[in-house]
Amino acid sequence: MRASVTITRDLLLIGGGHAHAIVLKMWGMQPLPGVRLTLVNPDPAAPYTGMLPGLVAGHYQRDALEIDLVRLARFAGARLVLDRVIGLDLARGHAQLNGRPDIAFDLVSIDIGIGSGIAGIDKGKAWPAKPLGAFADAWEAFVLDVVAGTKAPSVAVIGGGLGGVELAMAMAHRLGGACPDRHAIKITLVEAQQDLLATSAPALRKAMRSGLAELGVKVLTGSAVAAIAGPRLYLASGDALEAEFIATVAGARPAAWLGQTGLDLHRGFISVDQTLRSLSHETVFAVGDTAHMQANPRPKAGVFAVRQGPILYHNLRAALSGGRLKPFRPQSDYLKLASLGGQKAVAEKWGLSVSGAGLWRLKDQIDQRFMAMLSALPAMAAPEMTHGLVALEVRALEAAQPLCGGCGSKVGPEALASALADLAPPRRSDVLTGRGDDAAVLAWGTSDRQVFSCDHFRAFSLDPFVMAQITANHALGDIWAMGGEPQAALASIILPPMTKAKQSSTVAEIVAGFEACLRAAGADLVGGHTSLGAELTLGLSVTGLMQGRRPLGLGGARPGDVLVLTKPVGVGTVMAAEMQGLAKGRWVAASLQQMLVSSRQASRLLRDHAHAMTDITGFGLAGHVQGLLSAAQLSATLDLNQIGWTEGAIDLARAGIHSSIFPETSRLANALQASASVRADPRFDLLFDPQTAGGLIAAVPAEALEALSKAFADHGLGLWVIGILANELSHSPTLTVTA
């Protein structure tokens, strides 16, 4: 999170294509100081398209062909923005995004590939092979339906290029192993041209046609698709065919928004020179299928994108530092390896073709080597040790786990309690409660109450807009926990070293993030303070009004109440793993999305029923439940099986990964009642995991559960019944954990 060199330039990578993935890897090995690197991609992972037929055929699991952009971005020190670019304002140097404010850049590179589909055909009726995520999910669901006997094993693949032929054979192979009646399988390959693989060498066409025939794939050439209605595909000839699953690898086309940018285009693709720079705009580079190499036109193939990666890396650095650019010289021909459904492949180069199982093994080795290059990242460098003689304990602290962001960066509960032990109680009559609860309660007018709280922490995400939203959501949690309605907020912003222009654009993103969350909560951002420091740190002071309701808080739980939870637990562990490059990208994306979910509706549903309520933050689930119990003088039992867990958190806890504050929060474990087997359960450790923008815990009467469960379900919200309070008061409340 620290920026040791002042940020002077913004480099924006649009799309997580193969060339950009290579740039990220190389940038992590040798970054350019002073450059803030940003990657924008809709998904946390990008597919390696060369292994797609193997996934469809069942040879690979999905993880095997996903390039984890979250891990690569962390390794490169880049911020990853999970969104879609919809336009470029090249005059201002701004990228326009689908769901957030513009991102400014000094230099931009575009590697977004191509889409597939047929004009006039509803996307919901035919599955494009790209993007991979939706296609893979739909295909796996279809295979399960075939196995269950609820759908017929009939498939149509639209597009007779190399990708379509490979896909048809892969589907035939997969269904052959999944369907008990092989004679029921019907795979049809539909091509508008008069021949398959029209641009391929005759030897390759012959081998692929032989593979199709061997697998029983029916081929229709000269058959343009006119329409799709239900499970029926209508051809321009008037003929129709039935298919329960329709895939399209035809109609490859560039992103429509490129046509609105003013860039020099060739049939919709960005025209670039030999250095991969736009012919019309020197601040724009393009690679992969997005680009048209004006001097050396080549077919759309992944091999060129992979080989462009190192040249692009060099040229981006050169353009940002005043160096000399290198030309990219593509080979005139290349080895084509195509799978034949099963574990066999065909190879073609210079018009010669050969096939067999050995070539599938060769293809697999090449593919696996490429994926290993992007996934086997070097260990992240440890912070530099202090030189010379140091005080006692310094070396041990330097060797400890790096400090987490969010609530993982907070002071531990024991140190905080000790520091506040001598704090005097409020002296003013209008300050009704002070420390000890989620928010202070102040008198407001003659009869109302105002609740007041603040939160700030070091950033765990390099995306200022998302980090600001999460910070605001977290700060508002104290207002929601009291049952209040947010009123106003003041911001505290610490920026790392950067030029004035970068300060302006970064603060604009932060303010937009604060505003997006606060406005949705019904509150106003009314001011704040900024300063420069070592790293990005954000905070908010927030007020809320009770509007005539009694403030909720830690006190008030009653014997026999049940404990309910409104969000899964485990984001602290996932984000700690992300900092170390150990979390899967989809886990990180799920955690970020979880932290962006507001507790507004949950608070409104709970506050009329709850006897006590708090939000889960830095002390973890166990620590905050213990706070409720101590205030009510009641014991309770928690059931690990009833708690919702953040995706990936259990796997990471099992691997021994924890937040940096875990040694402090887990000291409470000694006071809990639990069997040895429960303590050995990785979920037990997650009870002490700090939560940023965590959910609410409420003590509610058992008779309110049915109505609450229905109300939460009606609003699409989760509600977990995680425990029950004892029926009798206790001077030494204990928390018992079961599983």
Question: Where on the chain are the PLM-derived regions?
Answer:
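Beta1-alpha1 glycine-rich phosphate/pyrophosphate-binding loop at the start
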Residues: 2-79, 166-200
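FAD-binding core/adjacent interface of flavoenzyme oxidoreductases
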Residues: 2-9, 77-156, 247
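A Rossmann-like FAD-binding core segment of flavoenzymes
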Residues: 80-92, 103, 173-274
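FAD-site-proximal beta/loop scaffold in flavoenzymes
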Residues: 124-151, 232, 240-307
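FAD-binding beta-loop-beta segment adjacent to the flavin cofactor pocket
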Residues: 268-285, 329, 345-346, 351, ...
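A conserved FAD-binding loop/helix module that cradles the flavin
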Residues: 290-339
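C-terminal auxiliary extensions adjacent to catalytic cores
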Residues: 342-395
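Helix-biased detector of long, well-ordered alpha-helical tracts
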Residues: 389-739
